[in-house]
Every structure is written in C-alpha cells, then in structure tokens.
C-alpha cells in the first residue's frame, strides 16, 4: 500500500481484542478494528485502553486500520 493512499485519523482505544487487535473510536465517532504496526511491535510499545492513537485507514476498507503512533 503506497503511503499516499492511506487516511490518517486520531482516535481513542476503546477495547483490547485477541491477537493484538484493538477497537478504536475515531474522532468522527466511527469505530474501527485496528492492529499494531510492525515498528511498534518491534519496539515493544504497549497500548492500553484509553490511549490516544493515530490510525492509518485504507480507502478500500474503512472498518479496519493500523495503529502507527501512540500519544503520551
């Protein structure tokens, strides 16, 4: 997926799901299922319920995303 094709949005982690998946509520109110990006997994960045995150969405499926950043 090319970098230009992604939609970046801010959201809050609502729930933790199995296999490092998370339910994230975006700023616009939509709820998506997101997984952790490879760099976050490699650097052991922990994500907890209530964390503010940046999610990349593909224009082809707006119900799934990738967490690329966790705000402090």
Curated annotation (Swiss-Prot):
Family: Belongs to the IF-1 family.
Subunit structure, interactors included: Component of the 30S ribosomal translation pre-initiation complex which assembles on the 30S ribosome in the order IF-2 and IF-3, IF-1 and N-formylmethionyl-tRNA(fMet); mRNA recruitment can occur at any time during PIC assembly.
Entry-linked PROSITE patterns: S1_IF1_TYPE
Protein name: Translation initiation factor IF-1
Keyword list, A-Z: Cytoplasm, Initiation factor, Protein biosynthesis, RNA-binding, rRNA-binding
Function: One of the essential components for the initiation of protein synthesis. Stabilizes the binding of IF-2 and IF-3 on the 30S subunit to which N-formylmethionyl-tRNA(fMet) subsequently binds. Helps modulate mRNA selection, yielding the 30S pre-initiation complex (PIC). Upon addition of the 50S ribosomal subunit IF-1, IF-2 and IF-3 are released leaving the mature 70S translation initiation complex.
PANTHER family per UniProt: TRANSLATION INITIATION FACTOR IF-1, CHLOROPLASTIC (PTHR33370:SF1)
Cross-referenced InterPro entries: NA-bd_OB-fold, RNA-binding_domain_S1_IF1, S1_domain, TIF_IF1
Compartment(s): Cytoplasm
Example GO molecular function: rRNA binding
NCBIfam families per UniProt: infA
Gene Ontology CC annotations of this record: cytosol
Pfam families: eIF-1a
Domain S1-like per the UniProt entry, residue ranges: 1-72
């Amino acid at each position: 997926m090319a970098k230009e094709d992604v939609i970046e949005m801010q959201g809050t982690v609502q729930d933790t799901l199995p296999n490092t998946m998370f339910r994230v509520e975006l700023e616009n109110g939509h709820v998506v299922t997101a997984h952790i990006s490879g760099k976050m997994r490699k650097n052991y960045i922990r994500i907890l319920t209530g964390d503010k995150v940046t999610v990349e969405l593909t224009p082809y499926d707006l119900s799934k995303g990738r967490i690329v950043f966790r705000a402090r």
